[in-house]
């Protein structure tokens, strides 16, 4: 049984309006013993007219006192950790290092949402290109990020890009990108970092979590030891999403 959800978002994230109390109460109803709030900081996020989003930023001077308040209020019921999800881009290495040194995060996820100025979520990166090309570019961009940024604990949803491919996972497998993925996993291990098992893949219609189970197995084969589990919930009903399936 998985009793900790290490990836969830609240109203402090640009893409969520969830109240912290509601997320905590949902976790309690689902029998969790620990949660980590990991709201988004994606500095220099590409602007999109349809959303009006210029950046995913968190007011940390409000965030930390608010989390401390809820941590104390629920101290006898559940452990609440103070986390953050950083959107990795190589040029932000210094900014993130300063940020994580300045604020006492309990846990930091490093995720690749932006690939050479584009978030696969919006689809432009796939225009006139095959899924194969974009997936490979994303894995290579992940390596670029790992070479530049070290201010995180685990690498989030490694194959996030597959959610948004034109064919999603129909032409996707670990074997097809083994060279790039192995380099990512070896780099993560050498850095003393971990990877995340993110159950949101199922929520987005994939037949697997992030990363693909073959990648999780390969990570272990290469000597990887750190795997955290997170739902990537942006709403209370998605806390601990499909955790039973992940446990199986």
Give the ranges of each region predicted by the language model:
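An N-terminally biased module of ancient metal coordination in phosphate/nucleic-acid-related enzymes
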Residues: 1-86, 90, 99-102, 164, ...
């Amino acid at each position: 049984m998985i009793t900790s959800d290490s990836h969830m978002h609240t109203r402090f994230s640009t893409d969520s309006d969830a109240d912290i109390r509601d997320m905590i109460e949902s976790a309690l109803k689902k029998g969790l013993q620990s949660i980590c709030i990991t709201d988004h900081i994606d500095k220099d996020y590409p602007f999109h007219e349809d959303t009006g989003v210029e950046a995913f930023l968190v007011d940390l001077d409000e965030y930390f006192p608010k989390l401390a308040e809820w941590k104390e209020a629920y101290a006898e019921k559940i452990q609440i950790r103070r986390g953050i999800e950083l959107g990795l881009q190589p040029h932000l290495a210094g900014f993130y290092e300063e940020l994580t040194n300045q604020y006492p995060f309990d846990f930091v996820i490093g995720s690749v949402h932006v690939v050479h100025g584009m978030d696969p979520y919006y689809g432009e990166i796939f225009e006139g290109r095959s899924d194969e090309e974009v997936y490979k570019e994303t894995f290579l961009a992940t390596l670029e990020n790992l070479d530049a940024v070290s201010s995180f604990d685990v690498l989030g949803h490694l194959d996030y890009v597959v959610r948004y491919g034109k064919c999603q996972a129909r032409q996707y497998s670990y074997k097809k990108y083994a060279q790039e993925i192995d380099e990512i996993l070896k780099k993560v291990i050498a850095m003393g970092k971990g990877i995340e098992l993110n159950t949101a893949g199922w929520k987005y219609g994939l037949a697997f979590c992030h990363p693909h189970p073959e990648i999780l197995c390969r990570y272990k084969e290469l000597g990887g030891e750190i795997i955290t589990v997170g739902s990537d919930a942006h709403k209370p009903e998605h806390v601990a999403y499909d955790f039973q399936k992940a446990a199986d």
